[in-house]
Amino acid sequence: VVKTNIVNDRGIHICKSMLAWKKYGNGETPETSGKKGDHLVGDYYVSFDKHYKAEVKELMAKFTAQGMSDDEAKAKAEAESPLMQEAREMLVKWEAGDPEVRGLWEMMNNWVYAGFDETYKKMGVSFDKIYYESNTYLEGKEKVMEGLEKGFFYKKEDGSVWADLTAEGLD
């Protein structure tokens, strides 16, 4: 048995935490807050969601006042949320290797890893091999692009990639 850990250390969820820390963190660190790094970064993920929901609610009110149905207003508000757009832009910059974004990512992920290590040590957990998504995602992205070209997947307006599995009874 080879004990492995697969760390999902990149993606929009990571950028949400990074953006919230950048906007609302005032330079807070695990040391200044007295919190484990993984808990601190998790707090910023929650902070992003709180601000995002408030933004969507405000935009929905604007759109329903313009005569849109609640469903239409919600979809438009979620699609046009400046906060979510910033998070997506940050992800694009991360993928392009932007030094500022990558520096913030490395700093915050190191906080998370230190918090994880503390927990693993307390629990007596160890791993033979650790895999980081940030080191493997390009291969997966290549496969997704091939799937799009071959028609196995489709892309939604928001840029997300989906597979239609209704024929398999999964929708």
Regions found by a protein language model. Give the residues of each.
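NTP-dependent nucleotidyl-transfer catalytic core
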Residues: 1-171
